[in-house]
Amino acid sequence: MTAKLPNEGKKSPKFLECVHEFFNDWKIKTVESHIMTKEQDETFSKGLKLPHLPDMVFAQNLLSITKNNSSISFCPFDALKNVNDHEDLVHVAGAKEWLEARKESAHLHNIVHPYDWTFSPINYRGTLDASISVSPTEDKIDYEKLKIQEKILFYKDVVLYEDELDDNGCSKLSVKIRAMPSGFFCLQRFYLRVDNTLIRVIDTRLYCSTDKPDEILREYSERECSIKELIDKSVPVSAWTDQNEIPSHLTLKMEATEKLTFPSK
């Protein structure tokens, strides 16, 4: 189903909405607003089982891609629904060492029950309307084609949520899109860095070409390495905080490619 924003009807004056109509009836919509209000925080908390939300949640932020009234959307609420709300912290990779080094953290003492404190939205590939069919495919996104310089018809980069993990790292989910004459490319990226412990990147990529205007290729991947592994591989420290460079240095843990077919008129 299309992503629903809590308190969607109560938009702030500081609210930016952009719509771009594209080839073959595609419509790209982005919404950007401020960090969520106390009222929105309460609404999120009621709809989620997490004992703690990221420090910065942009409740109304959204990116959606629509054709013939069917959409795939990306929003913070649906992403946070994919965060593990019951896993014991010590069972999360690297968490035992992280907790041991930070016994005095006030935030950790306030945890009511175990959950994924990194806010990793595992397997969140976007929110799909039921009318869109999904099937596995051997097709791959043509990245060489994407390297060809073209006129950018539309570009947006939207942050969904972010947390500094008590100043011990960074957890950030964002989604960006660019449209060109040959098609459009969208990347949702979750970047996680837990100092002295690990780095994780979870990507969802969407690509639609004018050659196949009724379908989207969707690639989902999870990559991760411990800090020790990065040091052993001599990955420069400067790359650890570079969200564009670091994925190529991480170990691929999971990958899947699907074809999304949108209904015709």
Spans of model-derived segments:
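Short, basic/low-complexity N-terminal boundary segments at the transition from targeting/disordered tails
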Residues: 5-52, 65, 167-173
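Acidic, low-complexity, intrinsically disordered interaction modules
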Residues: 40-142, 146-155, 159-244
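A composition-driven surface/loop motif
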Residues: 2-20, 24-27, 32-33, 223, ...
